[in-house]
Amino acid sequence: MYISLGRFLKKLRLENEEHLYDMAVKLKVSSAFLSKVENGKSKPPTKWESIIENEYKLTDDQKVDLCRCIQEARNNTTIN
């Protein structure tokens, strides 16, 4: 099933009982930037994939989904 990077990250946060700020700290970005990425307004940094995999101990299926979501987000970012 296809999900966007924003939905993937939000689901991951909820599963770990975190707020946007908590994930932003782990990713070493501001909450505002993380929000922009989640909403498709900014592209995710290339290093996020490995940081998220390590910080959240993703399953193999989650790693595949994350990779696909990040690639899709890099290709489809909307600028307003």
List the model feature ranges, each with a label.
Residues 1-15:
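A short, Lys/Arg-rich alpha-helix, primarily the initiator
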Residues 10, 21, 50:
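Residues within the helices of the helix-turn-helix
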Residues 7, 11, 25, 36:
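DNA-binding alpha-helical recognition surfaces that contact promoter or target DNA
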Residues 62-80:
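Short, charged recognition helix plus adjacent turn
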Residues 47-65:
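DNA major-groove recognition helix of helix-turn-helix/homeodomain DNA-binding modules
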Residues 16-35, 66:
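Short alpha-helical DNA-recognition segment
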Residues 28-44, 51:
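Recognition helix of helix-turn-helix/homeodomain-like DNA-binding domains
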Residues 13, 24, 53:
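The alpha-helix within a helix-turn-helix
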